[in-house]
């Protein structure tokens, strides 16, 4: 950058430059100068171990707009020279940056942003030089100076990548756990197996049933004779059985004894006897607490129901007086004769009233009261208000 800035500062409008390294055949009159393209390249005398890249020969080309023949010729010559110069400069600069930078990744990014900037092409005729990857541009003499970079771990940004990372971690943990499990001592496994066998034998012996006599063999003598006539060959075969067969037979005997105990009639019957318990007060509905005629809410439901029954029976047994008309034709003949004898002397209404009075005392009392009221109705009414006022004054 220092070389580029110096060129821009020393450039003048009349076409003169401070540097005098311009060959004669490249000079163009100032009337045709419209733009300047330049780049920095090392000289042939410069050694590859120079401390700075800016030391070198500056070459530039003036690109005219007219005529077209000159422009095309300048494009062809300038593209070849610029591509060669730029490629050599970038290679030198990349090697120099890699050798001097302690952290190559940061320095390379800065140099890449500077060197990868395209050359100023106002007419757009020159070709852009090919890109050079600085990480791979290593000379054989500088291999030892490069710092080995550790491979960066990519961070998953999608759901699929995250799931793959999680599954990888789980697989690693599973492999580690399986390795630790394989390191368990065989002695512990054998002790566990022996303990389980002992517990199994103890359980089989604990639930082994007592031998029961066979009733059929005792009743039938023929069967007992058959049992006594067993051949000696069969006894030898039974004696030569292995321990495993004996254990299997013991297990079968214990199972058969358990099944016999379940089928025996001495045990509890298959169908249990269901005895219905007496209902509690909480199980009886609340409607029975309010029996008609009883208002005792604290009384139990059963007693309340009994009281309601006795109350209903007592109502049926009580005889209540009824209004019976003796003049009705269904009455007794004595009453009819008595009524017929008195009809001539008394009027029909009086006779009927007297007959009713015998059977219903309420009607007679009401009639007597009504008659007395009629008699006293002719007397003037008392002035109660005046009497009360006079008593108050006295």
Curated annotation (Swiss-Prot):
GO CC, any one term: nucleus
Protein location: Nucleus
Domain of life: Eukaryota
Organism: Schizosaccharomyces pombe (strain 972 / ATCC 24843) (Fission yeast)
Cited InterPro entries: DUF2457
Region of interest (Disordered), residue spans: 177-295, 315-347, 370-394
Biased composition annotated in UniProt, kind: Polar residues: 191-207, 216-230, 370-379
Positions carrying Phosphoserine: 117, 121, 379
Keywords: Nucleus, Phosphoprotein
Biased composition (Acidic residues): 178-190, 231-263, 284-295
UniProt entry tagged with the keyword Phosphoprotein: yes
Protein name (database record): Uncharacterized protein C1259.08
Keyword Signal among record annotations: no
